[in-house]
Curated annotation (Swiss-Prot):
Residues 60-112 are annotated as: Disordered. The lineage of its organism: Eukaryota, Metazoa, Chordata, Craniata, Vertebrata. This is Synaptotagmin-17. It is found in: Membrane. Keywords: Differentiation, Membrane, Phosphoprotein, Repeat. InterPro entries: C2_dom (IPR000008), C2_domain_sf (IPR035892), Synaptotagmin (IPR001565), Synaptotagmin-15/17_C2A (IPR047897), Syt17_C2B (IPR014705).
Length: 474
């Protein structure tokens, strides 16, 4: 088969068509040869294809055509170079040849022995999804840890440090005989009965026995005199609305036989705990807690009622409440008057063993650290829950109001000696506590309106420690 060298045309459209056909024919045969070489050769070859024509015919192209020629041919395609004709006398290429660029292709063919020669294979890497910056790390077996046991955590706590009463856990597991033998505080006899018709609970305090003898003031030896016991009754968690029996003089086996009624719905009563506290009123007018008895009312039949003998256990409350006082304050800016109403008191400490208390209230106005005025209520005989409903008025200009303090002191009237101190509070510039401060601020914010509030009485020492106004009065 003869290879015909065509002379490129230099004129117009025909010249472009000829060059395009020659390039297309050459590229088709080049691609076919490259494919055959990739399937048959095991070594790496470099094939260079030059174009466009006129150019020297590659050797492998001439070898593929030699199989169609006769064996008598003298020259091979590789020995007969094809040279293009030129019209210029100096043998240079025409302007159409120089305007065409020369293409060069270099292909490195790798060994494909393992592939089938009949069809080409495309080597595609598997697609991996994930964060590009993440690094693969081999999974290591985790270190076995000790099995967690919740009990190990709670063993670190000491429950008795968080208990309100350190003896409560021990007492629950003991009988009344064991409690009496362990603490030796005596026993208390009482009963309960709920009235569904009137919705009230009746608590009857009957008697006590085997109460311990009182301790002397310094605590070093026992006082040979007998105790002066009484009982306080309340329904926890409400300790404000408590009841109190009379004081029984010089006895370790007091008989009370007193009844007290609590107005409370039946369902609410079942959620309460009955607390009875036995207190000793000694000859130094001190109130010392002997012991207590607590009964959850959900564990008893309130409607049917019942009687109990219960052993007394130690109480964490060594000091009893001093009582409460209900006051009303009102300031009139136009008149410059500070009005005070002493309404009532409840559950005051007894100051006389035989007659109870004859309480009265002293009101003292202090401006800065100077006592200005003193007034007092009348005293009521033989009661610890007095009703006064008495009003007092003090002249306080508005510019001096912020420096004013009111000192309220409850005394037990004593005709034979000085009056017995029961409790005190301070309201105003030098208030004795948060409750008193709140009452004073409410009055300042609501002029011409009476503001009522209950206050728990404090000891003289506590008031003197926190309020300078308390130090200025007697």
């Amino acid at each position: 088969m003869a290879y015909i060298q065509l002379e490129p045309l230099n004129e117009g459209f025909l010249s472009r068509i000829s060059g395009l056909l020659l390039c297309r024919w050459t590229c088709r045969h080049c691609c076919q040869k490259c494919y055959e070489s990739s399937c048959c050769q095991s070594s790496e070859d470099e094939v260079e294809i030059l174009g466009p024509f006129p150019a020297q015919t590659p050797p492998w192209l001439m070898a593929s055509r030699s199989s169609d020629k006769d064996g008598d041919s003298v020259h091979t395609a590789s020995e007969v170079p094809l040279t293009p004709r030129t019209n210029s006398p100096d043998g240079r290429r025409s302007s159409s040849d120089t305007s065409k660029s020369t293409y060069s292709l270099t292909r490195r063919i790798s060994s494909l022995e393992s592939r089938r020669p009949s069809s080409p294979l495309i080597d595609i890497k598997p697609i991996e999804f994930g964060v590009l910056s993440a690094k693969k790390e081999p999974i290591q077996p985790s270190v076995l840890r000790r099995t967690y046991n919740p009990d190990d955590y709670f063993r670190k706590f000491e429950p008795h440090l968080y208990s309100l009463d350190s003896n409560s856990d021990d007492v629950d597991s003991l009988t009344d005989e064991e409690i009496l033998s362990k603490y030796q505080l005596g026993m208390l006899h009482f009963s309960t009965q709920y009235d569904l018709l009137h919705n009230h609970l009746t608590v009857r305090v009957i008697e006590a026995r085997d109460l311990p003898p009182p301790i002397s003031h310094d605590g070093s030896r026992q006082d040979m005199a007998h105790s002066n016991p009484y009982v306080k009754i309340c329904l926890l968690p409400d300790q404000k609305n408590s009841k109190q029996t009379g004081v029984k003089r010089k006895t370790q086996k007091p008989v009370f036989e007193e009844r007290y009624t609590f107005e409370i719905p039946f369902l609410e009563a079942q959620r309460r705990t009955l607390l009875l506290t036995v207190v000793d009123f000694d000859k130094f007018s001190r109130h010392c807690v002997i012991g207590k008895v607590s009964v959850p009312l959900c564990e008893v039949d309130l409607v049917k009622g019942g009687h109990w003998w219960k052993a007394l256990i130690p109480s964490s409350q060594n000091e009893v409440e001093l009582g409460e006082l209900l006051l009303s304050l009102n300031y009139l800016p136009s008149a410059g008057r500070l009005n005070v109403d002493v309404i009532r008191a409840k559950q005051l400490l007894q100051t006389d063993v035989s007659q109870g208390s004859d309480p009265f209230v002293k009101i003292q106005l202090v401006h800065g650290l100077k006592l200005v005025k003193t007034k007092k209520t009348s005293f009521l005989r033989g009661t610890i829950d007095p009703f006064y409903n008495e009003s007092f008025s003090f002249k306080v200009p508005q510019e001096e109001l912020e420096n004013a303090s009111l000192v309220f002191t409850v005394f037990g009237h004593n005709m034979k000696s000085s009056n017995d101190f029961i409790g005190r509070i301070v309201i105003g510039q030098y208030s004795s506590g948060p409750s008193e401060t709140n009452h004073w601020r409410r009055m300042l914010n609501t002029h011409r309106t009476a503001v009522e509030q209950w206050h728990s009485l404090r000891s003289r020492a506590e008031c003197d420690r926190v309020s300078p106004a308390s130090l200025e009065v007697t």
